[in-house]
Curated annotation (Swiss-Prot):
It comes from Danio rerio. SUPFAM superfamilies: L domain-like. This is Leucine-rich repeat-containing protein 39. The keyword Repeat applies. Keywords: Cytoplasm, Leucine-rich repeat, Muscle protein, Repeat.
């Protein structure tokens, strides 16, 4: 009887063990099926969400002058969805005031992109993938929070226009930007630059430069290397003097230097016949110089131009030369009188 009891007990234990294992297996299979179902539902939901987002983005696409443009303004898009890659034929992004915080790394998929305009957002970083956009002609990132420009931007060989105004902490550019052989328009105003970066001086096609409202203390001595520059905006800086070589900028026709700390105007600038407009307003110039009265019939705008334009500059240089000569003569006379009295 004892042997039979033991045998029955063993069978019951084995049976219970198998029942437990079978139940666990069934539970595991059930959980796995539930997980698969959830993933399938998630994928289906994600697919539908992508379709909805894609449909919404397609509504923002317009065609102007044969160019495909994605235009979004005053909506909330802190990030751009990966589904956007399906619209890689877009040639221009115009995304303004949408709260965008970053440029997606999949930007490199948009090989047809000609204009990337993300002005007035909250972008903090330019991804290195930007360098793969070899057809890009315009990059507009003014009024953002960019503090660093990647060297890869120098690979955008067709870039003609770059705007980085009002990015708060931006104070330097990578030397590789001098590789932008076609760049003609550059706006770096309202930042933290203390001088014009070397890479900017070395841009061979640069025609228009705005570095107003920075903290420029000096201008580079080789500024004349910007041979094609015709417009230079430098108002609201900390400039105390101008290098003589500025007079060698033969293409320069507009020069704005208002609200700096200039004490003098280089005499050599008198020979800059190419200058059409120059502004020295609100500088603590050494000599108080006023142009002779103009005819009463001259309009106020013309008077304003005359007073603070090229005519003022030339008149100031002439007066400074005259007064400097008079001062030298006075000093010389005093010295001669002293020598005479001693004798």
């Amino acid at each position: 009887m004892t042997g039979v009891t033991v045998c029955c007990g063993t069978v019951n234990s084995i049976k219970a063990l198998w029942e437990t294992r079978i139940k666990k297996t069934k539970d595991d299979l059930k959980k796995e099926k539930e997980q698969k179902d959830r993933r399938a539902v998630g994928r289906l939901t994600g697919a539908w969400e992508d379709r909805i987002i894609l449909a919404k983005l397609k509504e923002k696409i317009v065609t102007e002058e044969g160019r495909v443009i994605l235009r979004i303004e005053k909506e909330e898009w802190k990030t751009l969805p990966p589904a956007l890659v399906q619209l890689s034929q877009i040639q221009e992004w115009q995304l303004h005031r949408i709260g965008l915080q970053r440029i997606p790394r999949f930007i490199s998929s948009f090989q047809s992109l000609i204009v990337l305009d993300l002005s007035r957002n909250s972008v903090t970083e330019i991804p290195k993938e930007i360098g793969k956009l070899t057809r890009l002609r315009e990059l507009l990132l003014s009024y953002n929070r960019v503090s660093y420009v990647p060297e890869e931007l120098g690979c955008c060989e067709n870039l003609e226009k770059l705007e980085l105004a009002m990015n708060r902490d931006l104070d330097e550019l990578p030397t590789q930007l001098s590789n932008l052989k076609k760049l003609s328009h550059l706006d770096l105003s309202m930042n933290q630059f203390t001088t014009i970066p070397d890479c900017v001086v070395n841009l061979p096609s640069l025609e228009w430069l705005d570095m107003g409202s920075n903290i420029l203390e000096t201008l580079p001595d080789n500024i004349h290397r910007m041979e094609k520059l015709h417009t230079l905006w430098l108002p609201r800086n900390e400039l105390e003097y101008l290098p003589d070589n500025i007079s060698r900028m033969k293409s320069l026709d507009t020069l704005v230097l208002s609200k700096n700390k200039l004490r003098d105007i280089p005499p050599l600038m008198e020979g800059m016949s190419n200058l059409r407009f120059v502004n020295f307003r609100d500088n603590p110039l050494t000599y108080d110089v006023t142009l002779p009265d103009l005819n009463e019939d001259v309009e106020e705008e013309e008077n304003d131009r005359e007073m603070f334009g090229r005519e003022f500059m030339n008149f100031y240089i002439q007066e400074a030369r005259k007064r400097g000569s008079q001062n030298f003569t006075s000093v010389l006379n005093v010295m001669l009188e002293g020598v005479s009295e001693t004798a």
